[in-house]
Amino acid sequence: MRFDAEVILNAEQSKTAHLLLQGLIDGARLAGVRVTVSERYSGAAPWLMLWGVGREAPLIAREQHLAAGGRVIHWDMGYIGRGKIDAHCRVCIDHDHPWRLFERTRPDPARWETFGLDLREDASPDGHIVVACLGRKSVKMLGLEGWEDRAIKRLRQRFPGADIVRREKPTSRHVSVPPIEDVIRGARLVVCRHSNCAIDAAIAGVPFECEDGAAYWLAQRDFTPDNRLDFLRRLCWWQWRHDEAPLAWEFIKEMLCD
């Protein structure tokens, strides 16, 4: 079976994105995918590979390609192991977040176990509530101006007297924001729209509420240790280092062709 993908690679992307994308392109070719590299979307292949969830240009290209009957592989920085050059990159298909395909994702523990993380129980039933703020690009792209204020208003009605902490989204490596682990430790609840904070909460054992994002799959289930672990095992199949790209593409082909 022949696999063809168009990849958008241009000067609008960061140096880090270029390096990671090149590794993903090389991995695609090693996995038997015929890759066409374009500066602008052309619809040259049945599959389209993009970098940057929540950015305007990739979103427009994705919508055009889906409308034409194609499939879209969309990459961004990872969920766990979020670094730069040695980072894991998260992948989703046709959407911003992969939770719709979690039922088809094997809960094999192998990838999760490579992180050496244990589930924690950091929640306190009488603790504070954390509201994870949106970043500027999400506010703009999704039309969510004031989302945090509305969320806090609802929470004050539900939990009179509770301490509510706004956790601003880090906008730059030069801006100091307390580590999310410290912010949610001792919390009773984390509330976000689609933030990775929900994944941190799943690891930490702090209940969370979200409207979208990878953790939405878990949000629809009981917040038990077994379900948390099941979620994290599935999640880790949706993120890869660029040096794992051939394996990533075998997984992507399985999800696209099954």
What are the residue ranges of the model-derived segments?
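Conserved catalytic-core segment of nucleotide-activated headgroup transferases in glycan assembly
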Residues: 122-173
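Donor nucleotide-activated moiety binding/catalytic core segment of transferases
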Residues: 37-40, 156, 160-209, 213-214
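Phosphate/adenylate-binding glycine loop and adjacent helical scaffold
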Residues: 62, 76, 82-90
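N-terminal pre-catalytic "stem/leader" segment of glycosyltransferase-like enzymes
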Residues: 1-47
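A short helix->loop->beta-strand "cap" motif at the edges of active sites that frequently abuts
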Residues: 67-71, 205-206
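Short loop/turn segments at strand-loop or loop-helix junctions that form parts
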Residues: 4-10, 75-79, 126-138, 167-169, ...
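Short, well-ordered secondary-structure micro-motifs within conserved domains or adaptor modules
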Residues: 38-66, 187-193
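Leloir-type glycosyltransferase catalytic cores
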Residues: 84-127, 217-258
